[in-house]
């Protein structure tokens, strides 16, 4: 019986620590309350994340000139349609002050089809979240609170990342 309890304890700790192996992820000890998180769609309509309470949200800040953004965008696109994450909403928010034609060309060049581009104009969210660079992804739980941040690029296809993210879904 002791061996069974020890085995379960060890297995639980191994899986609980898997997320620590994912580079560039910062998990907040306490979730941060967010207010007035508003950005624009490609028709300049305002999108407020409070309209998506009850969903797991990823705000991905990026720019067309950013090489790491180019690397991660296809896997982020696939994450949006991952069948294990049915309540996930991904919002790629361009902060490069780039025109919409250039952003649309970027999406076409990288075959991004599962979400639309969004825009932070005039860079209000970049300031609000104190972004230090791109790409940066803000992870928001079902209560509308920031619980983690990805600073830099990651492979959104990573099985450990998806498994960890499912615990918030």
Segments from the language model and where they lie:
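N-terminal "domain-start" segment that seeds a small globular fold
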Residues: 17-49
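Short loop/turn microsegments at loop-to-beta-strand junctions
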Residues: 34-35, 57, 134-135
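Short active-site neighborhood of thiol/selenol oxidoreductases, capturing the structured segment around
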Residues: 48-70
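Loop/turn elements at helix/coil->beta-strand transitions in domains of secreted/extracellular proteins
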Residues: 54-56, 86-89, 114
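Hydrophobic beta-strand anchors of alpha/beta hydrolase catalytic cores
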Residues: 58-59, 90, 137
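Thiol/disulfide oxidoreductase modules built on the thioredoxin-like
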Residues: 108-113, 120-164
């Amino acid at each position: 019986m002791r061996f069974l309890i020890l085995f379960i304890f060890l297995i639980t700790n191994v899986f609980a620590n898997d997320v620590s192996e994912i580079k560039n992820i910062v998990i907040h000890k306490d979730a941060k309350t967010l207010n007035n998180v508003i950005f624009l769609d490609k028709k300049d309509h305002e999108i407020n994340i409070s309209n998506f309470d009850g969903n797991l949200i990823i705000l991905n800040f990026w720019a067309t000139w950013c090489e790491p953004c180019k690397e991660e965008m296809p896997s982020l696109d696939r994450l949006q349609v991952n069948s294990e994450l049915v309540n996930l909403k991904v919002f790629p928010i361009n902060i490069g002050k780039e025109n919409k034609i250039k952003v649309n060309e970027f999406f076409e060049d990288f075959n991004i089809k599962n979400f639309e581009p969004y825009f932070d104009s005039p860079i209000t969210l970049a300031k609000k979240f104190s972004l230090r660079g791109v790409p940066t992804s803000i992870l928001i739980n079902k209560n509308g609170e920031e619980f983690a941040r990805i600073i830099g690029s990651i492979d959104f296809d990573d099985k450990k990342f998806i498994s960890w993210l499912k615990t918030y879904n």
